[in-house]
Amino acid sequence: MAQALGVARTRRPFVAADALLKAYSASARVNQYLVQELPAAVWRAPSPLPKGRTIAALVTHLHNCGLRYLERTAPGISVPAELDRVCVTPAQAARALGAKRRAVLAIVGTALKGDGRIVGFPYDAAGYLSYYMVHDAHHRGQIVLQARLLGHPIRRQTMIGMWQWSKRAKE
């Protein structure tokens, strides 16, 4: 409509680094959202799968993975401590996941604007974000399946909320 009236429409240029950070932010927030919405009965329940981990252990793994690369890349920036899968509570895990999200956005965001290097990681900053979005989605799928197998399926509203990336990215 604006063009029909002879008014030029101006759009901000697309910045891939910003788009990657926004996508990661949403994905990481979904991790935290899922933990906050989990039925309490599934947190420490033994896995029904052979050689399976508890949901607490899966969430601990989600959080702990990648922390060392962040510490090496930006030693001066605060990176959350690793979680202990044996004693972590859902509230502690949710807080830690939020802290990790903020650390990744700060550290990897800076790397994306610089040389793209994540110290010790075999790929660049964009690869780091992509790798961990896929990694985390895989484990979210395991958590959802395991909750169902334990007789406590994730609520429909929570499942819908996991796909509301625009909303999650703003939280």
Predicted feature residues:
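Short, surface-exposed alpha-helical recognition segments that flank or form part
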Residues: 15, 19-23, 88, 92-95
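Acidic catalytic patch
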Residues: 108-122
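Short, contiguous alpha-helical
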Residues: 1-9, 15, 21-32, 43-83, ...
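Helix-adjacent hinge/juxtasegments
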Residues: 68-108
